[in-house]
Amino acid sequence: MNHGVYQNLFIDSLDSVDPQIAEVLDLELRRQRDFLEMIASENFVPRAILQAQGSVLTNKYAEGYPQNRYYGGCECVDLAEDLAISRVRDLFGSEFANVQPHSGSTANAAALMALTEVGSTIMGLELDHGGHLTHGMPLSFSGKHYKAVTYRLDPKTCLIDMDSVRDLALRHRPSVIIAGWSAYVRHLDFEAFRSIADEVGARLWVDMAHFAGLVAAGLYPSPIPWADVVTSTTHKTLAGPRGGFILAKKEFGKAINTAVFPGQQGGPLMHVIAAKAVAFKVAASEGFRERQRITIEAARTVAKRIGEDYRLRDRGIDILTGGTDVHMVLVDMRKSDMDGLTGQNLLHEVGVTVNRNSMPYDKRPPRITSGIRIGTPALVTRGLSLDEFDEVADIISNALLTIDLPKQKQRALRIARTHPVYEGLRQY
């Protein structure tokens, strides 16, 4: 049998085997270089993470856990997973860690499976008030398999009112209380959540997917002393590969391991786990902590500049809660003729990437929304200064006011090209 044709496909580079996909990679690299990435859930991973994720570990199947696999030949990938586990435990001071979840949503599903029974009552922040799909949204597994009740933000302050959370918990007696968010710009009171959970006999699960990097840097309260289980993604503020992990008190370790495998997944992605290990090592560095500090300061700079722009206020556009304590800014358009989708598209037109986002008590549908979410992590990773973030905020304001869009695009491109990303990177 002549294997020559396949052998060529096996050893040839991507541009030879599949030029169409090679072109997609080139186009995306160009987009990332020339746009100002301000989606709060995105970041740029270090080149070392790209290398780990694109490694020969892709080839290895490893169902089970280190030193207890269902396949042979796992002695090398065991080393990678053991490193990832020990590093993330040390990083956050946790008794237990599982680094196998393919995503944050998978980690969340496993957390619920480990903590409670199908059909039981769970309680989390409502989606359009800043929660996440997996915290009880009706179309999600969390809303289909569990009886979900949701707490809302105070209509005046747009903050979580812990007295209201307590009243809701006493009324519904959930088995799991969820503290966490995808769009909330202030700190959570984990001690108060713990007190409420204890009062009603609930488990406390914290989803720190968005703020894990801030916790690692000591710039956001740690949920570890208070929560029974903590879930997170490894991207966003952690700037690692796309994936998830679970931290917990030791007593929940066995249930979580079973919930992840075989409960939610089969074989883990060992190349991604190796990349997670790299991310956890980087996150323990002083340079990472400094970057997180700048990330928050940059978000505050953007919030202040946009919030103080009288031209936007005259159009009914403001900053939700008047500022931020985290890596994101929520631009509130509920009183404006402009909607979130229009704002997102205008910013994309000038080379700034954001996402539209529902606001508390939003009257517009989710595909339109009354706000946009702006994040600073990716641009801080690129090296922008606070003065440059001030200019970026001015670009955003002018774009939302439709003032000389070609000029705003030129300004954004100049800033982007001042801070090149992945210089000299060979993708194939």
From Swiss-Prot:
One of its GO terms (molecular function) is pyridoxal phosphate binding. It holds the Pfam family SHMT. GO terms for cellular component: cytosol. Its cofactor is pyridoxal 5'-phosphate. It is an enzyme of class 2 (transferase). Pathway: One-carbon metabolism; tetrahydrofolate interconversion; Amino-acid biosynthesis; glycine biosynthesis; glycine from L-serine: step 1/1. Keywords: Amino-acid biosynthesis, Cytoplasm, One-carbon metabolism, Pyridoxal phosphate, Transferase. (6S)-5,6,7,8-tetrahydrofolate binds at residues 127, 131-133. GO terms for biological process: glycine biosynthetic process from serine; tetrahydrofolate interconversion. The modification N6-(pyridoxal phosphate)lysine is found at residue 236. Its EC number is 2.1.2.1. The record marks 235 as: Plays an important role in substrate specificity. It catalyses: (6R)-5,10-methylene-5,6,7,8-tetrahydrofolate + glycine + H2O = (6S)-5,6,7,8-tetrahydrofolate + L-serine. It is found in: Cytoplasm. Homodimer. Belongs to the SHMT family. Catalyzes the reversible interconversion of serine and glycine with tetrahydrofolate (THF) serving as the one-carbon carrier. This reaction serves as the major source of one-carbon groups required for the biosynthesis of purines, thymidylate, methionine, and other important biomolecules. Also exhibits THF-independent aldolase activity toward beta-hydroxyamino acids, producing glycine and aldehydes, via a retro-aldol mechanism. This is Serine hydroxymethyltransferase. It comes from Tropheryma whipplei (strain Twist). The gene is glyA.
